[in-house]
Protein backbone atom coordinates (compact mmCIF):
# COMPACT_ATOMS: atom_id res chain seq x y z
CA UNK A 1 0.00 0.00 0.00
CA UNK A 2 1.43 3.38 -0.99
CA UNK A 3 1.65 6.36 1.35
CA UNK A 4 -0.98 8.21 -0.69
CA UNK A 5 -3.34 5.25 -0.47
CA UNK A 6 -2.79 4.95 3.27
CA UNK A 7 -3.51 8.63 3.74
CA UNK A 8 -6.68 8.32 1.69
CA UNK A 9 -7.95 5.48 3.89
CA UNK A 10 -7.49 7.48 7.09
CA UNK A 11 -10.82 8.81 8.36
CA UNK A 12 -13.88 8.98 6.14
CA UNK A 13 -12.41 10.85 3.18
CA UNK A 14 -12.15 7.74 1.00
CA UNK A 15 -15.88 7.11 1.36
CA UNK A 16 -16.71 10.64 0.31
CA UNK A 17 -14.48 10.24 -2.75
CA UNK A 18 -16.19 7.01 -3.82
CA UNK A 19 -19.68 8.42 -3.27
CA UNK A 20 -18.79 11.55 -5.24
CA UNK A 21 -17.49 9.37 -8.08
CA UNK A 22 -20.70 7.30 -8.09
CA UNK A 23 -22.85 10.44 -8.18
CA UNK A 24 -20.76 11.89 -11.01
CA UNK A 25 -21.09 8.67 -13.02
CA UNK A 26 -24.86 8.61 -12.44
CA UNK A 27 -25.17 12.25 -13.49
CA UNK A 28 -23.28 11.53 -16.71
CA UNK A 29 -25.40 8.45 -17.40
CA UNK A 30 -28.69 10.29 -16.89
CA UNK A 31 -27.57 13.18 -19.08
CA UNK A 32 -26.53 10.77 -21.85
CA UNK A 33 -29.93 9.05 -21.68
CA UNK A 34 -31.62 12.45 -21.99
CA UNK A 35 -29.42 13.32 -24.98
CA UNK A 36 -30.29 10.06 -26.72
CA UNK A 37 -33.99 10.66 -26.09
CA UNK A 38 -33.73 14.16 -27.57
CA UNK A 39 -31.75 12.93 -30.59
CA UNK A 40 -34.56 10.51 -31.39
CA UNK A 41 -37.17 13.25 -30.99
CA UNK A 42 -35.32 15.71 -33.25
CA UNK A 43 -34.21 13.16 -35.82
CA UNK A 44 -30.61 14.34 -35.86
CA UNK A 45 -27.43 14.42 -33.83
CA UNK A 46 -26.52 17.47 -31.82
CA UNK A 47 -24.99 20.29 -33.93
CA UNK A 48 -26.09 18.70 -37.24
CA UNK A 49 -27.77 21.38 -39.39
CA UNK A 50 -29.55 21.72 -42.73
CA UNK A 51 -27.70 23.70 -45.39
CA UNK A 52 -30.57 23.67 -47.90
CA UNK A 53 -34.30 23.16 -47.67
CA UNK A 54 -34.30 19.96 -49.74
CA UNK A 55 -30.74 18.71 -49.76
CA UNK A 56 -28.61 17.07 -47.11
CA UNK A 57 -25.91 18.77 -45.08
CA UNK A 58 -22.83 17.26 -43.45
CA UNK A 59 -21.16 18.74 -40.38
CA UNK A 60 -18.86 17.49 -37.67
CA UNK A 61 -20.71 16.53 -34.47
CA UNK A 62 -18.99 18.11 -31.50
CA UNK A 63 -16.78 15.68 -29.63
CA UNK A 64 -17.67 12.72 -31.85
CA UNK A 65 -15.27 13.33 -34.71
CA UNK A 66 -17.66 11.77 -37.21
CA UNK A 67 -19.89 13.02 -39.97
CA UNK A 68 -23.59 13.55 -39.24
CA UNK A 69 -26.15 13.79 -42.03
CA UNK A 70 -29.58 15.39 -41.57
CA UNK A 71 -32.33 15.79 -44.14
CA UNK A 72 -35.37 18.01 -44.20
CA UNK A 73 -37.60 14.93 -43.89
CA UNK A 74 -35.96 13.78 -40.64
CA UNK A 75 -35.48 17.05 -38.75
CA UNK A 76 -38.42 17.71 -36.43
CA UNK A 77 -37.41 20.72 -34.33
CA UNK A 78 -34.50 22.58 -32.77
CA UNK A 79 -32.65 22.74 -29.47
CA UNK A 80 -33.41 25.49 -26.99
CA UNK A 81 -30.65 25.44 -24.38
CA UNK A 82 -30.58 23.60 -21.04
CA UNK A 83 -31.90 23.91 -17.52
CA UNK A 84 -30.61 22.41 -14.30
CA UNK A 85 -32.65 20.07 -12.14
CA UNK A 86 -31.79 18.42 -8.85
CA UNK A 87 -32.66 14.73 -8.64
CA UNK A 88 -32.37 12.58 -5.52
CA UNK A 89 -31.87 8.85 -5.94
CA UNK A 90 -30.42 6.03 -3.88
CA UNK A 91 -27.07 7.25 -5.21
CA UNK A 92 -27.59 10.63 -3.50
CA UNK A 93 -28.47 14.07 -4.81
CA UNK A 94 -27.17 15.17 -8.23
CA UNK A 95 -27.70 18.19 -10.45
CA UNK A 96 -28.68 17.26 -14.00
CA UNK A 97 -28.31 19.52 -17.06
CA UNK A 98 -31.59 18.77 -18.82
CA UNK A 99 -31.65 19.69 -22.55
CA UNK A 100 -34.56 21.74 -23.87
CA UNK A 101 -36.00 21.80 -27.39
CA UNK A 102 -38.92 22.96 -29.53
CA UNK A 103 -40.63 20.39 -31.76
CA UNK A 104 -42.40 21.25 -35.01
CA UNK A 105 -46.15 20.61 -35.11
CA UNK A 106 -46.20 20.52 -38.92
CA UNK A 107 -48.39 23.62 -39.25
CA UNK A 108 -45.72 26.25 -38.67
CA UNK A 109 -46.09 26.19 -34.86
CA UNK A 110 -43.88 24.52 -32.28
CA UNK A 111 -44.30 22.92 -28.87
CA UNK A 112 -41.93 22.33 -25.98
CA UNK A 113 -40.27 18.91 -25.92
CA UNK A 114 -40.90 16.97 -22.71
CA UNK A 115 -38.56 14.11 -21.86
CA UNK A 116 -39.77 10.80 -20.44
CA UNK A 117 -36.66 10.06 -18.41
CA UNK A 118 -37.29 12.81 -15.85
CA UNK A 119 -41.02 13.65 -15.90
CA UNK A 120 -41.99 17.20 -15.01
CA UNK A 121 -41.84 17.96 -11.29
CA UNK A 122 -40.23 14.63 -10.39
CA UNK A 123 -37.34 15.33 -8.04
CA UNK A 124 -36.93 11.87 -6.49
CA UNK A 125 -36.82 8.34 -7.88
CA UNK A 126 -39.56 5.88 -6.91
CA UNK A 127 -37.04 3.93 -4.83
CA UNK A 128 -36.29 7.02 -2.76
CA UNK A 129 -39.97 7.79 -2.26
CA UNK A 130 -40.48 4.20 -1.10
CA UNK A 131 -37.54 4.50 1.31
CA UNK A 132 -38.86 7.77 2.73
CA UNK A 133 -42.40 6.48 3.07
CA UNK A 134 -41.17 3.20 4.51
CA UNK A 135 -39.19 5.02 7.19
CA UNK A 136 -42.25 7.08 8.03
CA UNK A 137 -44.56 4.05 8.06
CA UNK A 138 -42.19 2.34 10.48
CA UNK A 139 -43.12 4.89 13.11
CA UNK A 140 -40.54 7.66 12.71
CA UNK A 141 -41.82 11.24 12.56
CA UNK A 142 -41.12 13.48 9.57
CA UNK A 143 -38.31 15.47 11.17
CA UNK A 144 -36.47 12.36 12.35
CA UNK A 145 -36.83 10.69 8.96
CA UNK A 146 -35.21 13.73 7.35
CA UNK A 147 -32.30 13.65 9.77
CA UNK A 148 -31.85 9.89 9.44
CA UNK A 149 -31.76 9.98 5.64
CA UNK A 150 -29.49 13.02 5.45
CA UNK A 151 -26.49 10.68 5.62
CA UNK A 152 -27.72 8.99 2.44
CA UNK A 153 -28.98 11.94 0.41
CA UNK A 154 -26.91 14.78 1.84
CA UNK A 155 -27.78 17.55 4.23
CA UNK A 156 -30.99 19.26 3.17
CA UNK A 157 -31.78 16.53 0.63
CA UNK A 158 -34.77 15.26 2.60
CA UNK A 159 -36.70 17.86 4.57
CA UNK A 160 -39.71 17.09 6.76
CA UNK A 161 -41.89 18.66 4.06
CA UNK A 162 -40.36 16.27 1.52
CA UNK A 163 -41.18 13.35 3.82
CA UNK A 164 -44.75 14.59 4.23
CA UNK A 165 -45.22 14.92 0.46
CA UNK A 166 -43.78 11.46 -0.17
CA UNK A 167 -46.05 10.02 2.51
CA UNK A 168 -49.14 11.68 1.03
CA UNK A 169 -48.22 10.34 -2.43
CA UNK A 170 -47.81 6.78 -1.11
CA UNK A 171 -51.06 7.06 0.87
CA UNK A 172 -52.95 8.25 -2.23
CA UNK A 173 -51.51 5.42 -4.34
CA UNK A 174 -52.40 2.89 -1.63
CA UNK A 175 -56.00 4.06 -1.43
CA UNK A 176 -56.36 4.02 -5.23
CA UNK A 177 -54.87 0.51 -5.39
CA UNK A 178 -57.43 -0.74 -2.88
CA UNK A 179 -60.28 0.61 -5.02
CA UNK A 180 -59.02 -0.37 -8.47
CA UNK A 181 -61.29 -2.36 -10.79
CA UNK A 182 -60.41 -6.03 -11.29
CA UNK A 183 -62.86 -6.87 -14.09
CA UNK A 184 -60.15 -6.68 -16.75
CA UNK A 185 -57.77 -8.97 -14.85
CA UNK A 186 -57.61 -12.44 -16.40
CA UNK A 187 -57.18 -14.27 -13.09
CA UNK A 188 -57.25 -18.06 -13.41
CA UNK A 189 -55.78 -19.01 -10.04
CA UNK A 190 -55.69 -17.63 -6.50
CA UNK A 191 -53.03 -18.17 -3.84
CA UNK A 192 -54.19 -17.20 -0.34
CA UNK A 193 -52.37 -17.18 2.99
CA UNK A 194 -52.04 -15.14 6.15
CA UNK A 195 -49.22 -14.09 8.45
CA UNK A 196 -49.13 -12.67 11.97
CA UNK A 197 -47.50 -9.33 12.83
CA UNK A 198 -47.47 -7.23 15.99
CA UNK A 199 -48.83 -3.69 15.85
CA UNK A 200 -49.59 -0.93 18.32
CA UNK A 201 -53.30 -0.89 19.16
CA UNK A 202 -54.67 1.27 21.98
CA UNK A 203 -51.08 1.76 23.15
CA UNK A 204 -50.56 -1.97 23.51
CA UNK A 205 -48.68 -4.47 21.33
CA UNK A 206 -51.30 -6.61 19.62
CA UNK A 207 -51.00 -9.56 17.23
CA UNK A 208 -53.02 -9.18 14.03
CA UNK A 209 -53.22 -11.14 10.80
CA UNK A 210 -52.24 -9.85 7.38
CA UNK A 211 -54.39 -11.65 4.82
CA UNK A 212 -52.68 -11.90 1.42
CA UNK A 213 -54.23 -12.76 -1.94
CA UNK A 214 -52.10 -13.35 -5.02
CA UNK A 215 -53.64 -13.87 -8.43
CA UNK A 216 -52.19 -15.79 -11.36
CA UNK A 217 -53.10 -14.40 -14.77
CA UNK A 218 -53.75 -16.53 -17.81
CA UNK A 219 -50.22 -15.74 -19.03
CA UNK A 220 -48.76 -17.08 -15.78
CA UNK A 221 -47.82 -13.73 -14.23
CA UNK A 222 -48.41 -13.46 -10.48
CA UNK A 223 -49.99 -10.22 -9.21
CA UNK A 224 -50.82 -8.96 -5.74
CA UNK A 225 -54.60 -8.61 -5.51
CA UNK A 226 -55.08 -7.75 -1.85
CA UNK A 227 -53.36 -7.32 1.50
CA UNK A 228 -55.65 -6.62 4.43
CA UNK A 229 -55.07 -6.36 8.18
CA UNK A 230 -57.59 -8.37 10.20
CA UNK A 231 -58.00 -9.60 13.75
CA UNK A 232 -57.51 -13.20 12.63
CA UNK A 233 -58.07 -15.72 9.84
CA UNK A 234 -61.71 -16.49 10.54
CA UNK A 235 -64.27 -17.31 7.87
CA UNK A 236 -65.80 -13.85 8.35
CA UNK A 237 -62.44 -12.11 7.88
CA UNK A 238 -61.64 -13.97 4.66
CA UNK A 239 -65.20 -13.61 3.40
CA UNK A 240 -65.07 -9.82 3.86
CA UNK A 241 -61.84 -9.64 1.86
CA UNK A 242 -63.10 -11.89 -0.94
CA UNK A 243 -66.45 -10.07 -1.12
CA UNK A 244 -64.56 -6.82 -1.73
CA UNK A 245 -62.52 -8.38 -4.56
CA UNK A 246 -65.65 -9.79 -6.20
CA UNK A 247 -67.43 -6.43 -5.88
CA UNK A 248 -64.54 -4.89 -7.84
CA UNK A 249 -64.86 -7.43 -10.64
CA UNK A 250 -62.85 -10.51 -9.65
CA UNK A 251 -64.18 -13.56 -11.49
CA UNK A 252 -64.31 -17.12 -10.21
CA UNK A 253 -60.83 -18.68 -10.51
CA UNK A 254 -60.17 -22.17 -11.82
CA UNK A 255 -58.16 -23.16 -8.73
CA UNK A 256 -57.42 -21.78 -5.26
CA UNK A 257 -54.24 -22.71 -3.37
CA UNK A 258 -54.71 -22.37 0.40
CA UNK A 259 -52.75 -22.91 3.60
CA UNK A 260 -55.32 -25.27 5.13
CA UNK A 261 -56.90 -22.78 7.54
CA UNK A 262 -60.55 -23.89 7.95
CA UNK A 263 -61.90 -20.32 7.93
CA UNK A 264 -60.38 -19.63 4.52
CA UNK A 265 -61.69 -22.84 2.97
CA UNK A 266 -65.19 -22.20 4.30
CA UNK A 267 -65.15 -18.66 2.91
CA UNK A 268 -64.11 -19.88 -0.55
CA UNK A 269 -66.69 -22.67 -0.66
CA UNK A 270 -69.45 -20.32 0.51
CA UNK A 271 -68.73 -18.14 -2.53
CA UNK A 272 -67.90 -20.82 -5.10
CA UNK A 273 -69.25 -24.19 -3.94
CA UNK A 274 -67.48 -26.22 -6.63
CA UNK A 275 -64.11 -24.45 -6.71
CA UNK A 276 -61.14 -26.88 -6.75
CA UNK A 277 -58.87 -26.34 -3.73
CA UNK A 278 -55.23 -27.28 -3.29
CA UNK A 279 -54.02 -27.42 0.30
CA UNK A 280 -50.40 -26.40 0.75
CA UNK A 281 -48.23 -29.51 1.10
CA UNK A 282 -45.60 -27.63 3.14
CA UNK A 283 -48.17 -26.58 5.73
CA UNK A 284 -49.49 -30.16 5.85
CA UNK A 285 -46.02 -31.60 6.44
CA UNK A 286 -45.58 -29.33 9.46
CA UNK A 287 -48.97 -30.47 10.70
CA UNK A 288 -48.08 -34.16 10.33
CA UNK A 289 -44.83 -33.71 12.24
CA UNK A 290 -46.72 -31.96 15.04
CA UNK A 291 -48.83 -35.11 15.50
CA UNK A 292 -45.86 -37.36 16.31
CA UNK A 293 -42.92 -37.56 18.73
CA UNK A 294 -39.94 -35.45 17.67
CA UNK A 295 -37.79 -38.54 17.07
CA UNK A 296 -40.08 -39.48 14.16
CA UNK A 297 -39.94 -36.08 12.42
CA UNK A 298 -37.24 -36.97 9.86
CA UNK A 299 -38.89 -40.27 8.99
CA UNK A 300 -42.27 -38.60 8.44
CA UNK A 301 -40.63 -35.94 6.30
CA UNK A 302 -38.83 -38.55 4.16
CA UNK A 303 -42.00 -40.59 3.57
CA UNK A 304 -44.12 -37.51 2.86
CA UNK A 305 -41.55 -36.06 0.45
CA UNK A 306 -41.25 -39.39 -1.35
CA UNK A 307 -45.04 -39.38 -1.83
CA UNK A 308 -45.56 -35.73 -2.82
CA UNK A 309 -42.58 -35.58 -5.20
CA UNK A 310 -43.34 -38.79 -7.10
CA UNK A 311 -43.11 -38.40 -10.88
CA UNK A 312 -46.66 -39.34 -11.87
CA UNK A 313 -50.17 -39.06 -10.46
CA UNK A 314 -50.43 -42.86 -10.21
CA UNK A 315 -47.14 -43.02 -8.31
CA UNK A 316 -48.34 -40.34 -5.89
CA UNK A 317 -51.56 -42.29 -5.30
CA UNK A 318 -49.69 -45.55 -4.69
CA UNK A 319 -47.27 -43.96 -2.22
CA UNK A 320 -50.17 -42.26 -0.48
CA UNK A 321 -51.68 -45.68 0.23
CA UNK A 322 -48.31 -46.97 1.41
CA UNK A 323 -47.90 -43.95 3.72
CA UNK A 324 -51.30 -44.59 5.30
CA UNK A 325 -50.65 -48.31 5.81
CA UNK A 326 -47.32 -47.67 7.51
CA UNK A 327 -48.34 -44.81 9.77
CA UNK A 328 -51.63 -46.36 10.88
CA UNK A 329 -49.46 -48.95 12.59
CA UNK A 330 -46.59 -46.71 13.67
CA UNK A 331 -48.41 -43.51 14.73
CA UNK A 332 -52.14 -43.44 14.05
CA UNK A 333 -52.42 -39.67 14.57
CA UNK A 334 -50.15 -39.04 11.57
CA UNK A 335 -52.23 -41.24 9.28
CA UNK A 336 -55.46 -39.67 10.53
CA UNK A 337 -54.06 -36.19 9.85
CA UNK A 338 -53.18 -37.12 6.27
CA UNK A 339 -56.63 -38.61 5.72
CA UNK A 340 -58.21 -35.44 7.12
CA UNK A 341 -56.61 -33.43 4.31
CA UNK A 342 -58.48 -35.56 1.79
CA UNK A 343 -58.26 -35.06 -1.96
CA UNK A 344 -57.55 -31.35 -1.56
CA UNK A 345 -53.94 -32.17 -0.71
CA UNK A 346 -53.53 -33.93 -4.07
CA UNK A 347 -55.43 -31.65 -6.47
CA UNK A 348 -52.10 -30.72 -8.06
CA UNK A 349 -51.85 -34.23 -9.55
CA UNK A 350 -54.81 -33.39 -11.80
CA UNK A 351 -52.72 -30.68 -13.48
CA UNK A 352 -49.97 -31.09 -16.09
CA UNK A 353 -46.73 -32.13 -14.28
CA UNK A 354 -45.04 -28.89 -15.39
CA UNK A 355 -47.39 -27.03 -13.01
CA UNK A 356 -46.95 -29.23 -9.96
CA UNK A 357 -44.13 -27.23 -8.38
CA UNK A 358 -46.07 -23.96 -8.34
CA UNK A 359 -49.50 -25.49 -7.64
CA UNK A 360 -48.89 -27.65 -4.58
CA UNK A 361 -47.78 -24.95 -2.11
CA UNK A 362 -48.42 -21.36 -1.07
CA UNK A 363 -44.66 -20.72 -1.23
CA UNK A 364 -45.18 -17.70 -3.49
CA UNK A 365 -46.75 -15.91 -0.51
CA UNK A 366 -44.48 -17.53 2.07
CA UNK A 367 -41.46 -15.96 0.36
CA UNK A 368 -43.16 -12.57 0.50
CA UNK A 369 -43.84 -13.11 4.21
CA UNK A 370 -40.18 -13.93 4.82
CA UNK A 371 -38.94 -10.86 2.96
CA UNK A 372 -41.47 -8.62 4.70
CA UNK A 373 -40.48 -9.87 8.16
CA UNK A 374 -36.80 -9.52 7.29
CA UNK A 375 -37.40 -5.85 6.52
CA UNK A 376 -39.22 -5.22 9.82
CA UNK A 377 -37.19 -7.50 12.11
CA UNK A 378 -35.59 -4.54 13.91
CA UNK A 379 -39.04 -3.38 14.99
CA UNK A 380 -40.85 -5.51 17.52
CA UNK A 381 -44.08 -3.56 17.01
CA UNK A 382 -45.37 -1.65 13.96
CA UNK A 383 -47.24 1.65 14.45
CA UNK A 384 -50.68 0.46 13.32
CA UNK A 385 -52.58 -2.25 11.46
CA UNK A 386 -52.96 -0.08 8.35
CA UNK A 387 -49.28 0.77 8.13
CA UNK A 388 -48.42 -2.95 8.35
CA UNK A 389 -50.55 -3.63 5.27
CA UNK A 390 -49.15 -0.58 3.47
CA UNK A 391 -45.57 -1.65 4.15
CA UNK A 392 -46.24 -5.09 2.68
CA UNK A 393 -47.87 -3.57 -0.40
CA UNK A 394 -45.12 -0.98 -0.72
CA UNK A 395 -42.41 -3.62 -1.15
CA UNK A 396 -44.06 -4.73 -4.39
CA UNK A 397 -45.42 -1.35 -5.52
CA UNK A 398 -41.94 0.20 -5.32
CA UNK A 399 -40.32 -2.68 -7.20
CA UNK A 400 -38.18 -3.76 -4.23
CA UNK A 401 -39.76 -7.21 -4.66
CA UNK A 402 -40.92 -8.51 -8.02
CA UNK A 403 -43.23 -11.40 -8.85
CA UNK A 404 -42.39 -13.78 -11.69
CA UNK A 405 -44.50 -16.15 -13.74
CA UNK A 406 -45.53 -19.49 -12.26
CA UNK A 407 -43.81 -22.66 -13.38
CA UNK A 408 -45.63 -24.42 -16.20
CA UNK A 409 -47.55 -21.30 -17.21
CA UNK A 410 -47.73 -22.39 -20.85
CA UNK A 411 -50.18 -25.16 -19.86
CA UNK A 412 -52.48 -23.04 -17.67
CA UNK A 413 -55.27 -23.28 -20.25
CA UNK A 414 -55.63 -27.05 -19.74
CA UNK A 415 -58.60 -28.30 -17.72
CA UNK A 416 -58.21 -30.21 -14.46
CA UNK A 417 -58.22 -33.98 -14.96
CA UNK A 418 -60.46 -36.25 -12.91
CA UNK A 419 -58.95 -37.48 -9.62
CA UNK A 420 -57.58 -41.02 -9.46
CA UNK A 421 -59.94 -43.50 -7.76
CA UNK A 422 -57.93 -44.99 -4.90
CA UNK A 423 -60.41 -47.84 -4.51
CA UNK A 424 -60.01 -48.98 -8.10
Could you say what each language-model-derived stretch is?
Residues 1-8, 13-14, 36-39, 44, ...:
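Acidic/histidine-rich catalytic cores and adjacent linkers
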Residues 1-138, 146-172, 176-188:
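Short, flexible loop/hinge motifs at secondary-structure junctions
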Residues 15, 19, 23, 27, ...:
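Amphipathic alpha-helical transducer elements in NTP-driven molecular machines
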Residues 79-82, 93, 99-121, 127, ...:
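RNase H-like nuclease fold core
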Residues 133-140, 356-361:
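Short basic-aromatic helix/loop recognition motifs at nucleic-acid
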Residues 230, 288, 299-307, 311, ...:
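A short, charged helix-loop
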Residues 255-262, 267-303:
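Conserved beta-strand -> loop -> alpha-helix junction used to position metal-binding or nucleic-acid-contacting
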